[in-house]
């Protein structure tokens, strides 16, 4: 699949439910039909069994190669997620880069390597498998 087609998949915020692990019980509460710069998304999920509401804004939108979302409200002190797509041999490579800070530092920093980091790795591994299956 070319970068344009893959980017179109990400431009539909409702596809997030299909690529998010079921154990998070992710549900979109409010979102536009198509993402663009300035779009707001409200959703709920469960982190470590606790109900969380999260609000995200799309702050950069550069079809078909990049977009960035930031958390406006949610569990992190800071969350910035850069999604990059690059045309590759017969398809598209997708890269995710996340910058985050936890609340309750420095205590949270002690737990981060064994909790949050592993949890995020599991989420992104699941997403990669789902994206590959859905966009094949």
Regions found by a protein language model. Give the residues of each.
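Residues at helix-coil transition
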Residues: 11-12, 132, 136
